[in-house]
Amino acid sequence: MKPVIALVGRPNVGKSTLFNRLTKSRDAIVADFAGLTRDRHYGNGRQGKHEYIVIDTGGFEPDASSGIYREMARQTQQAVAEADVVVFVVDVRGGLSAQDHDIANYLRRLGKPCVLAGNKAEGMQDSMHLAEFYELGLGEVHPVSAAHGQGVRSLVDLALKPLALPEIEEEDAAAEKNVIRLAVAGRPNVGKSTLINTWLGEERLVAFDMPGTTRDAISVPFERNGQKFELIDTAGLRRKGKVFEAIEKFSVVKTLQAIESANVVLLLLDATQGVTDQDAHIAGYILESGRAVVIAVNKWDAVDDYGRQQLERSIETRLSFLKFAPLHFISAKKRQGIGPLWSSIIQAYKSANRKMPTPVLTRLLQEAVQFQSPKRSGMFRPKMRYAHQGGMNPPVIVIHGNSLEHVTDAYKRFLEARFRKEFDLVGTPLRIEMKTSSNPYTDKQNS
């Protein structure tokens, strides 16, 4: 599981600037769940081989008792509860304040790992302004400049150091055993717990023992018709004796971590509410993570024909970027349409791990170019020479040639469609990378 870092501090100390600095490698804000998370923004960051989730919070006043400030305090407390480590951001130029003392007292009581970041510290590394923050009793103050990126890398190293991050081999071990890691993702009250409880209650679904490989989250190993699965918790799974039961408990962090840990994600929508912004955010994160995906529309029995037509159009437009995903209409409560989900989940998993031989890929590429060559861009016409597979889960096809930086997105989609058809790739993203050969005459021409 990715570790979670929460950025905490009073208003206007530079938390959002630091958040954007930490997450810029993954397009800053990944999920801003309007209404649900209010002043908590969730993003992905990466440093070296380590990836992490960052939570950006609103200004924190632990003792706020009214209006928006109370809500901001509640949201920040929730972010701290979700986090593995807290980065307490203070304003070095603004100096120590009573609010800083209040926040420090709150964090000390929690006993959670905490790193003190002195922001806006450009040119002040040895300044007496830093010394006063030792009064907070949280150890050394680490000077950073979020705006200029100074000290940010070492700050992340300090934050991640006490977490004893798990090695990546855990995922590889599960893959070798042909265990499909499955996550059911969706916003609150779409029926995740109902669907999971229906699955866990099936006679054909037999639990088996497998050592837990994820930190903090609950996962349930089971077997169905000879295929082993590992259900990753996104719905508040709780053990009752020897039985697992799901309760509808939404956690953004748990959802993002489950998606990252899964081989296949079942995206659950609510037919009675259509495709919401939250649905689109979750769907976008699934695509960004490169996970195989199956879409299921729950409560299908609760809408009339007109509502169904409207919903289908909404899915086509708002989730057009997942058009490769199998689409199912179900009623978890009435157990309607649930059976066919399993074949789509297995098909998506197999597609994500499909091996594509280089000779076949190159032949398909040449046939595609012969049928429709890429358009010229000014003086340059892209020339494609050969293709090979660059990865699996998701599958990646690398195309080599000349002037490939001028290949249009429309032509890439044209190629994608032909590759998908040949290899029967259903339910998985397909990434196409263009690699232009270096021109040995360029330097001579420019000299």
Curated annotation (Swiss-Prot):
GO terms for molecular function: GTP binding; ribosome binding. The gene is der. Gene3D superfamilies: 3.30.300.20, P-loop containing nucleotide triphosphate hydrolases. GTP 1 binds at residues 9-16, 56-60, 119-122. Associates with the 50S ribosomal subunit. InterPro entries: G_ENGA, GTP-bd, GTPase_Der, KH_dom-like, KH_dom-like_a/b, P-loop_NTPase, Small_GTP-bd. Residues 3-167, 180-353 form the EngA-type G domain. This is GTPase Der. Keywords: GTP-binding, Nucleotide-binding, Repeat, Ribosome biogenesis. NCBIfam families: GTPase_EngA (TIGR03594), small_GTP (TIGR00231). Pfam families: KH_dom-like (PF14714), MMR_HSR1 (PF01926). It comes from Acidovorax ebreus (strain TPSY) (Diaphorobacter sp. (strain TPSY)). GTPase that plays an essential role in the late steps of ribosome biogenesis. Belongs to the TRAFAC class TrmE-Era-EngA-EngB-Septin-like GTPase superfamily. EngA (Der) GTPase family. HAMAP family: GTPase_Der. GTP 2 binds at residues 186-193, 233-237, 298-301. GO terms for biological process: ribosome biogenesis. Residues 354-438 form the KH-like domain. It comes from the Bacteria.
